[in-house]
Regions:
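C-terminal regions of RecA-like/P-loop NTPase motor modules
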Residues: 2-10, 191-227
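Glycine-rich P-loop/Walker A and Walker A-like loops and their local beta1-loop-alpha1 context
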Residues: 13-67
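Conserved inter-motif catalytic segment of the P-loop NTP-binding fold
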Residues: 58-121
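Short, structured coil segments at secondary-structure junctions
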Residues: 78, 143, 166-168
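Substrate-engagement module of ASCE P-loop NTPases
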Residues: 122-123, 128-154
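Phosphate-binding/switch region of NTP-binding enzymes
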Residues: 152-207
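Conserved mixed alpha/beta core segments that line enzyme active sites in large multi-domain catalysts
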Residues: 154, 270-272, 276-317, 373-771, ...
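A conserved helix-loop-beta module that forms one wall/lid of the active-site cleft
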Residues: 283-344, 350, 356-359, 363-372, ...
Length: 858
């Protein structure tokens, strides 16, 4: 940074404490950052002692930023402000702490920092050392505070040194040759003398300039000029590779070091990594990382689940030919921070991290993240990655530090982007970089911000890594997709039949890309599979299998270079390279009817019922084994995203795409159900179709959406209803409220239900979806989707009420007789009280019993 860049120029000079050097250089200007390159830390101590003594004498406010775990660089701290910081807290926390210290000190302040090499060693990253300096140096310069830093010579890459040189005002080499101290200025900004850039010998308070060629040659011949400098991460990686042939104890020590670097020391999964990953595994993971830093929760979960299944005694033989190998890459968290720093977004990020700026600056930061540039060094690594995959489709997925961790699933909060990977190399690079930008920008979307805020994570250091995966599947004409995909849960909390074994687990199963399994899709249904009896159908599916089946398939269109949704018949018409009967068959009733009247049967709908897959293959057996072994090793229920592909003989390979702990509350103690005198004495009662364990919950308020009035609204007004529900949700925070409405809550299609975001119902104790079959409004049993993951994680009890079922009672008139108090609760907002009703229901309670599979509200 140049002095001319600063609006004001401080004229008072600051002494280095070495008079001869002050004379040559003209002293230090306020705002000068001085970086000393040293061989020995004692050489740095020599110039620090002189600087501190003189600054104290000149009544400067001397501040020492101490993060070295051993002795301080300053001996006498009696007149120095000591600030001890912990590097283990990470880049963001550490850097913010330094900036807060600087902010609180007087204008007459000077600073001494421990060697930046300790940052490099603590974070295993040249990149983050440079990032820290690039955001701290300009801040000190801006307020006019001089500061001393040091780095160990030949310990950084040339790229790192270049970034430090570019940022600092003064860069000095300091040498100790035969007991004499020499200073050699390499960069001194905004001043010049004919002898300034010669080496200078320090003799107490005096300076002798070395101008003789003979003396200079003799001096510099002592130094090691390396043509190639490896970063600290690369040095450690090379040590790890070398350790592969060494003794077991050395391998274990090096392996633990790599786990700490890539996973994190405090991660709960750290011990599991130690158990299931060998040093060779960790070296393989490290070799596929772009940049440095952590690889994030999603990457770790995928790797861990795969390792458990392939290495556990009870499953390794069974799955040796079933588990599809992965060849993923990881963009480390340091790249995320570098992207922020290099695009000038650090100050904005710091504003956004404050309470008052959390939402205020989010959109501006989101725009900045979406439109930044990557460094040439990182772009070169991106190109190597794309060359590796060729034109095979890949997916760029978020893998933040907190994501998919114990306690925080972040289900669907951050983006994932498919790269169909067609076009010229430059086009593919642009699409790939845009995908990463989109993931980075998604850290500032409203859902993610609210999620972190609601869980007390808004102050946590949320670093974003990227998981790059080859899309599982194959080419079928112009389309690319896996045969099947979905979500698997080891614990089936949503049961619709007393006979279902909850511990057997469940699947959400779709044909094609798994995007339809994790989202609440429009005009469509996925297959729900209870793994204790895979052919058992949920009630509504059993009633009309064709209607309540999957009608659309998500695919990658190679010609259009985009994600596309097509009808099932379009997807199955090409050669699937396996037997299409595994997944479904033509609608037989329609086919017979067409034949009777002589109509062409070629366009009869293909119904995805998966009957043969579930009855005649070992797929569900394999999935049950995966869920059992992974959940047992996690000692926790798990949620797994998977794909599977079949060959001509019907043999399959399963790909574990993602694994995370499934956030659940316990089933709770058995609840004594009230005895109902008759079916009209309750508000509702149902057998099955609820989720949330055994409960007895007080319901003080019911927010009810009138189906008859809702369906009459134009589309735009239906979206307004969703926003108004969000207003009521905020007002009822901390109160026992139940949300009741037609069809699917959270559908993006307002014709199927109220299109709320999860944050617009997150304060409810209970969510109830009501079927009105005469209006084509039906609940969707989407347990396993991101939406339902949010329900489970937040502890919201769920119930679906199906009309025209003998074991379901819903006395809607009991509500309609009550006064609508919505205008009393929300006085300032414009609420449509014809559609939205709020009832005071104090005294009402919900009871549920898992064993009997009964839920009652009375």
């Amino acid at each position: 940074m140049k002095y001319s860049d600063r609006g004001d120029v401080f004229m008072d000079k600051i002494s280095t404490g070495i008079k001869g050097f002050d004379d040559i250089m003209g002293g230090l200007y306020p705002g000068d950052n001085v970086v000393w390159q040293v061989e020995d830390i004692n050489n740095y101590k020599h110039v620090v002692d002189a600087f501190v003594r003189k600054s104290i004498k000149d009544e400067k406010n001397v501040n020492y930023i101490h993060f070295r775990k051993v002795n301080s660089i300053i001996d006498d701290l009696s007149k120095v402000n000591l600030f001890e910081l912990d590097l283990a807290k990470g880049f963001e926390d550490f850097t913010m702490s330094v900036h807060n210290i600087i902010k609180t000190q007087s204008e007459n302040a000077v600073y001494v920092f421990d060697s930046l090499t300790y940052i490099q060693r603590g974070w295993y990253s040249d990149l983050m050392t440079a990032n820290f300096f690039k955001v701290t140096c300009p801040y000190l310069y801006k307020i006019g505070a001089a500061a001393y830093f040091s780095i160990k010579r030949n310990s950084y890459t040339y790229d790192t040194i270049a970034k430090i040189r570019e940022t600092t005002q003064i860069l000095m080499d300091i040498y100790n040759v035969d007991g004499s101290i020499y200073i050699h200025p390499l960069k001194v900004e905004n001043r010049y003398t004919p002898i300034l850039f010669f080496p200078h010998k320090i003799e107490e308070d005096k300076i002798t300039t070395i101008t003789s060629s003979g003396e200079a040659s003799k001096l510099f011949s002592h130094f090691d000029w390396r043509n190639k400098r490896l970063g600290y991460w690369r040095i450690n990686f090379n040590k790890a590779k070398a350790a592969l042939t060494q003794d077991e104890s050395t391998q274990e020590r090096i392996k633990q070091n790599l786990i700490d670097i890539l996973v994190g020391k405090d991660s709960k999964i750290n011990e599991m990594c130690k158990q299931y990953f060998t040093l060779a595994d960790m070296v393989q993971i490290a070799s596929r990382e772009i940049g440095t830093g952590f690889i994030g929760g999603k990457s770790i979960g995928m790797l861990m689940a795969t390792a458990i299944v392939s290495k556990s005694e009870e499953t390794k033989e069974y799955f040796k030919d079933i588990l599809e190998p992965h060849d993923s890459f990881y963009v480390g968290t340091d790249v995320f921070y570098s992207y922020i720093v290099e695009n000038g977004l650090w100050d904005l990020r710091m504003k956004q991290k404050t309470d008052e700026g959390y939402f205020k600056y989010a959109k501006e930061l989101q725009d900045g993240l979406q439109n930044g540039k990557f460094s040439e060094m990182i772009e070169e690594q991106f190109m190597h990655l794309l060359e590796y995959y060729g034109q095979c489709p890949i997916i760029v997925r978020s893998s933040s530090l907190l994501e998919d961790n114990f306690g925080n699933a972040f289900a669907g909060k951050y983006d994932s982007v498919f790269c169909i990977n067609q076009g010229t190399p430059s086009q593919r690079l642009k699409a790939f970089e845009d995908a990463i930008r989109t993931v980075y920008a998604s850290t500032m979307n409203e859902d993610a911000l609210n999620y972190r805020k609601n869980r007390g994570l808004d102050k946590r250091d949320e670093q974003m890594a990227i998981l790059v995966q080859r899309v599982s599947g194959d080419y079928y004409g112009e389309y690319y997709f896996p045969h099947i995909a979905g979500v698997a849960n080891s614990s089936n909390l949503y049961v619709w039949n007393k006979k279902i074994d909850m511990d057997a687990g469940m699947l959400r199963l779709v044909f094609g890309l798994g995007t339809r399994a994790v989202d609440r899709v429009n005009n469509d249904y996925v297959r729900i599979v209870a793994l204790d009896d895979p052919t058992r159908l949920p009630a509504m599916t059993k009633k009309d299998p064709q209607r309540f089946s999957q009608h659309y398939v998500d695919v990658l269109n190679l010609n259009k270079n985009e994600l596309e949704t097509i009808i099932v018949n379009e997807a199955v018409k090409s050669n699937l390279k396996t037997q299409s009967s595994l997944f479904g068959s033509k609608d037989k009733e329609t086919e017979e009817r067409f034949k009777r009247v002589g109509i062409d049967t070629s366009n009869i709908p293909f119904v995805l019922n998966f009957e043969r897959l579930l009855r005649s293959t070992k797929f569900t057996e394999a999935m049950r084994k995966i869920l059992k072994v992974v959940s047992s090793k996690y000692n926790y229920p798990v949620d797994i995203e998977y794909t599977a592909n079949f060959d001509k003989q019907g043999n399959f390979r399963i790909n574990i795409v993602q694994c995370r702990p499934l956030q659940t509350r316990g089933l709770g103690k058995t609840v004594e159900l009230p005895k109902l005198e008759d079916k009209n004495s309750c508000l509702f009662s149902s057998t099955g179709n609820f989720m949330g364990g055994n409960v007895r919950l007080a319901i003080d308020y019911i927010v009810f959406i009138s189906s008859d009035d809702y369906v009459k609204l134009p589309e735009v007004e239906k979206y307004n209803i969703a926003r108004q529900v969000g207003i009521i949700n905020k007002e009822l925070k901390g109160k026992n409220a139940m949300l009741m409405g037609p069809g699917r809550w959270g559908s993006s299609n307002p014709e199927l239900g109220v299109p709320v975001k999860f944050t617009e119902l997150c304060n409810m104790s209970v969510m109830c979806e009501i079927a009105y079959s005469n209006q084509d409004l039906m609940p969707e049993l989407s347990y396993g989707s991101h939406f339902f993951q949010d329900l489970v994680e937040t502890g919201i009890f769920y119930v679906a009420l199906f009309d025209n079922k003998e074991d379901v009672v819903f006395n809607e008139n009991k509500l309609r007789k009550k006064e609508n108090i919505v205008k009393q609760i929300i006085k300032d907002a414009n609420i449509n009280d014809e559609v939205i009703k709020v009832y005071d229901t104090k005294g009402l309670q919900i009871y549920s019993d898992i064993t009997q599979q009964i839920v009652t509200c009375s």
